[in-house]
Regions:
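Alpha-helical transmembrane segments of multi-pass membrane proteins
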Residues: 124-480, 486-694
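Membrane-embedded alpha-helical bundles that constitute the cytochrome b-like, heme-associated redox core
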Residues: 1-128
Length: 694
């Protein structure tokens, strides 16, 4: 028997997917039924020929005991093509089922209705009712497209390392493929009919469910588990997954516009835009403010499917009987599928594809990303957008984060901790005789998880705040400045606004939002809240004993950024590279300091760490840091750029020119061939989208 498994599920899924697409294209009038039958009959012949030929070869090999080295591989191919043969045969049978039904009828006469709904078949409706009914078509298109974009964009970010670059790639593919779909409609010789448009709009609400399933199912099949996708993989992956929906969406927009123009006997492009935009606005409000907070992704898609089908049902009620009868069935099917999805726990089961070998304990879509808690061997793992935030019982990481910084001083005052309230970092901070520990968390859901899993420290000195750390620091800075401006002594009022240490336990600056907490402007705000010789601590990914070119750039940028604000900066290597900054003295000899302060630790002590080794490794890192590195600023986010470049280096050097140059050439060719009106529309769209981004 061959070691390679048979691809029964994969082949079945691919065949059903492409047959569904071709069938939808036939129903919508993009291709003819004859063309579709030719394609699948050709594939049927190919499957028969290949499966039969390989089967004959295998039979000869077995009968005459011929030693064929590729026997096992041929056997796999034979079975795989056999699976495809069976499926395509079923498709072929479905095309000719009427022929077989006639064999069992008493009479050979077959009534055939080729009734089609063309542009002039609205004579029973008044002009007003006709126009209002047809306006629901672009409204349904806009509603479904925008709702799907809002729901799926969050899921793409949760799978493809969500940052601004990933968002840009997804949106670029979305717009490009939608435009291609609109162009394809111009190549269609058949005029759009109501039956085809309604079928297309119904499919537009069905396709996202399949897309979301494929997104989770294929992630760890195409890419290694736990790996970071490269930019090329994100481009190709999102283009593959988005193409069915976006091509169909673009085709439908052009088809609806043409249909309305012919039905209303006027140019209806502006009307199509207006009602499509209205549908988008309604979907944006409904999804962004209500659905995303109440339901999970599959449930949201089910709700969109039900709403979409209801709108199409209202349209079909005023159409000819053949259309109306079909959409009664569509509505029943949509409602059944929608409510089944709402009741079934599909989201958790599908999400499990992303975390093989782990048990999903809890998950929640939040405004800040998808939080997932998994369990393995008694350890809880917290993920945000498929990126590991922290794990419980990670003693080394927790102790390094806290004690490398706090052992530098005799801590008796206030400490500000950004992140880490439930990971164990706060517990380590509370080992010191500090007055108050203030912890800032951006996502309130983290605190709810902490309470659920009993991870919150029970200490009256701990105060937890929710919100953006930068806004909080800015507000405290302004309050402190007002107090200092008074003429009388205000030391008591200053106490809650002064900290002996600020620890930034946050992810690396992979997004512009996080990068705001790594700029010299933010470090300057933090310094105003520190007492004299107070310190700030932050960390970046560890470089161990070797620092590559990209890693050196981001480390140098952060070092020079801190150096513009503080007199002294030291880097202590560990599970991460910890940057300590202060106007007072700093040392990497932390075990000696720990022995003096008698703080109980399991890892950061003289039994596990050697001060001389730490000092030597620290000196080696600081020796390599470039003094000419750029400073990370609010309006010049070099840190985010360097971090993204470091991420891209994991997949090798990606040549952006291979992507940019073909696009520029296509734009030039399109500009030469386009009319003045098209160029004007392109310029307006480019300008408006540029304003949306900035």
């Amino acid at each position: 028997m061959p070691d390679t498994p048979y691809s029964v599920i994969t082949i079945s899924f691919v065949c059903l997917l492409f047959y569904g697409i071709s069938l939808a294209f036939e129903r919508m009038g993009i291709v003819t039924g004859e063309w579709q039958r030719k394609v699948w009959n050709t594939l049927l012949l190919l499957s028969v020929y290949v499966a039969g030929s390989i089967g004959l070869l295998l039979a000869i090999t077995v009968n005459y005991k011929i030693n064929l080295p590729v026997f096992n591989k041929l056997l796999v191919w034979h079975v795989d093509f056999g699976v495809a043969l069976v499926l395509i045969s079923i498709f072929h049978f479905s095309h000719h089922i009427k022929y077989y039904l006639r064999l069992f009828r008493k009479t050979g006469a077959v009534s055939k209705s080729n009734e089609k709904h063309t542009f002039g078949q609205h004579s029973l409706q008044t002009g007003y009712r006709l126009g209002f009914n047809l306006k629901r078509l672009p409204f349904s298109l806009g509603f479904t497209a925008m709702a799907t974009q809002l729901i799926l964009l969050r899921e793409f970010l949760a799978v493809f390392y969500g940052n601004e670059l990933s968002i840009g790639i997804v949106l670029a593919n979305w717009l490009l493929l939608t435009g291609v779909g609109a162009v394809l409609n111009r190549k269609t010789t058949n005029q759009p009919v109501m039956k085809g448009i309604l079928t297309g709009l119904f499919l537009l609400a069905i396709v996202p469910v399949v897309m979301l399933f494929l997104l989770y199912w294929l992630r760890n099949i195409v890419l290694p588990v736990g790996s970071l996708p490269g930019i090329g993989q994100i481009i190709l992956g999102t283009a593959f997954l988005l193409s069915p929906f976006c091509l169909l969406s673009g085709w439908l927009f052009s088809a609806v516009s043409l249909y309305l123009s012919n039905s209303l006997k006027q140019n209806a492009i502006s009307l199509t835009y207006e009602w499509e935009t209205l549908g988008s606005v309604v979907a944006g409000i409904l999804c962004s403010l209500i659905l995303i907070f109440l339901f999970e992704p599959f449930q949201n898609l089910a709700i969109v499917l039900i709403i979409n089908s209801s709108i199409l049902f209202l349209i079909s009620r005023k159409e000819i009987y053949s259309v109306r009868k079909k959409f009664y069935l569509y509505l029943v099917a949509a409602v059944f599928v929608g409510f089944a999805t709402l009741i079934a726990n599909l989201d958790k089961n599908i999400l499990q594809f992303l975390y093989p070998g782990q048990k999903i304990i809890s998950f929640k879509d939040t405004p800040y990303g998808k939080l997932v808690v998994t369990e393995k061997a008694g350890q809880l793992n917290f993920f945000d957008n498929n990126t590991l935030l922290f794990t419980t019982n990670n003693v080394i990481a927790n102790e390094e984060t806290v004690h490398y910084a706090l052992l530098q001083r005799k801590i008796t005052g206030n400490v500000l901790l950004v992140g880490g309230s439930i990971s164990g970092v706060a517990d380590e901070c509370l080992k010191y005789p500090l007055k108050r520990l203030e912890c800032v968390e951006l996502n309130p859901r983290i605190l709810l998880f902490g309470r659920t899993f009993n991870l919150l420290p029970h200490d009256p000195r701990l105060k937890i705040y929710f919100g953006d750390a930068r806004i909080m620091v800015k507000r405290k800075q302004e309050e402190k400045a007002k107090i200092l401006s008074r003429s009388y002594s205000a030391q008591k009022a200053l106490d809650p606004l002064s900290y002996e240490a600020i620890i930034l336990n946050i992810p690396e600056p992979t997004t512009l939002q996080i990068n705001r907490l790594y700029t010299c402007e933010f470090f300057g705000m933090c310094k105003t809240l520190l007492v004299e010789k107070g310190m700030l601590s932050m960390s970046l990914a560890s470089t161990t004993d070797y620092m590559g070119a990209d890693a050196l750039k981001i480390q140098s940028t952060m070092y020079q950024t801190l150096k513009t604000v503080f007199q002294n900066v030291v880097v202590i290597p560990g599970e991460k590279n910890y940057f300590l900054a202060s106007d007072g003295s700093l040392t990497p000899a932390v075990t000696m300091l720990g022995a003096d302060q008698k703080i109980e630790t399991e890892y950061v002590n003289e039994y596990y760490l050697d001060d001389a080794s730490l000092a030597e490794r620290s000196a080696n890192i600081m020796k390599r840091i470039s003094v000419q590195a750029s400073v990370n600023r609010d309006l010049s986010p070099v840190g985010c750029y360097r971090q993204l470049h470091y991420w891209l280096s994991y997949q090798g050097n990606f040549n952006f020119y291979l992507l940019v140059i073909p696009l520029i050439i296509l734009l030039i060719i399109a500009g030469i061939r386009a009319s003045g009106t098209t160029v004007a529309l392109f310029s307006a769209g480019l300008s408006s989208f540029h304003l949306k981004l900035f």
